[in-house]
Amino acid sequence: MNTLRHSFFNMKSPFPYLAILLFANLATIHADDAPSPPANAGKPATPEVKIEPFDFDKEDANAHAAYFLKKRKSAAADPYRPLYHFSPPGFGLHDPAGLCKWQGKYHLFYLYSPPGLQWSRGHAVSDDLVHWSDLPMLPTSIRLGTGQAWADNDRVLLTIGEGKLFTASDPLLEKWTEHPVKFPGADNYIWREKDHYYITKAAGGPNTALEILRSRDLTKWDSMGNYLNDGYFTEPGTDGSCNNVLSLGGGQHLILFFSHNQGPKYYIGKSDLGSGRFSIQHHGRMNYGPVMRGGLHAPTGFVDTDGRCIGMWNVMECTIQDNMLGHKGEMISLPRVLAANKEVTADEGWNIRPINPLTIDPVEDLKKLRFNPVKLENVTIPANGQQPLAGVKGRAMELEAVIDPKSAREVGLRILQSPNGEEQTTISLSMHGYAWPWHSNKRELMIDVSQASLSPDVASRTPEIGPLYLKDGELLHLRVFIDRSVIEVFANGRQCLTLRAYPTRPESTGVSVFARGSEARLVSLTAWQMKSIWPELKEQEGR
């Protein structure tokens, strides 16, 4: 095996990446000479060059490796390129379309759009869900519509939106065989329980999000009717795209999907595969702002061999004008561990104060990326003011903070902040509890990027605001992941908000804490710089 082929599958040396997106005519792209960092509100240069031809079906793995390596290296100068999130090797990424573990390695499939091949399948592999390496694109026959992957005992099943099913069993899932029988529907999720295979497919009819089919042999499929059907939780138009049905253990299941009119959602409940019905116990959202405007989009998930339920989403971006094309590329969120909150009862009733029904945490392996910690303790946050945090700055960081709001109305962090505050992103918790005792513990977690960028190419976007229910006396615990143009905020293990931000000033790296109404206290904060998972971006670490 030559050096290039060896490094292609070396998990410790994942490839750099490029997110060059196509214009509609697909004749030219804003491309390989990545734009220089914008100065103030200026626009980056976007020269047009001819697309380099590449036959994804005929070229071998070494050629794929060299092609992807070149594309990833060409993006290294892009100031908004994430250091530790997955992004594709050039061209457009859309829905994640399958996540599974096969023979000890994690595999991610995603919709990928090289020239003339819209919605083909990109493929990456990882040892830890953090460091990724590109694998050759799947055959171009595996395209046109999203789908999911599921690891069976002796093979991996992959669905695509045309109702096609593909299987593979080789170590790196490179050799795919099309199953001879198609099944009805689109946006399908497939799995097996006992002696039956099941497929859920997007529905979108009145009060119906998902339908379910059953088969013993993957050949003859019988419809079992509406799987997720509830007029209160699923309004007309909730189409159940990119759906996943995942076991939470204890007889509970988690449904993830994307609604084109409401965004990504989840349902916790009981799955009765005898009758083909899902009984909803709890319902929630993964995105609380405008759909397709810099937040989470489509999900993919699986249950790991250790029982963890893992979910990942693409971070959609439609707020950037076309002449900032280099910044518009979608990426995949950090992997999240999802579980049912054991403190929630099945029927909350009027007299029980609600809490977030789903726990959400980043995977532990992300801690391997930390370096150069800065620790602060017992910092007073002045009333109606802010306190800059000395020595805490950067564009690719993790912050872990504990804040005691005391009696303040709002507390939080300002990140990616310029010295004069012209650019800043605000993360806050509002203490707007209701007078009713069963809602008095409700708080509002927020990311506000309305002041994040001075660029006229960045369209305005309302804040992302999600509920966070706190126990009596519970402090605010934040884990904030900043990765140049994407921000993920985990709060108390029970809420997570995600947004994109595009600061233009090189000095927009500061962090401060603030309080409104009265004084608060920063109990502790640790800030780490984060290592790049892409070798050619190593020089950007710590900046």
How should each PLM-predicted stretch be described?
Residues 33-236, 247-293, 313-377, 414-419, ...:
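Beta-rich carbohydrate-recognition and catalytic domains
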Residues 17-26:
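Bacterial N-terminal signal peptides
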Residues 3-17:
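Bacterial N-terminal signal peptides that target proteins for export
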Residues 241-246:
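Functional cores that coordinate and move charged inorganic groups
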Residues 68-70, 272-294, 303-543:
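Beta-rich accessory regions
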Residues 190, 298-301:
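Short, surface-exposed beta-strand/loop micro-motifs that present aromatic residues
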Residues 29-31:
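Boundary at the C-terminal end of the N-terminal hydrophobic targeting segment
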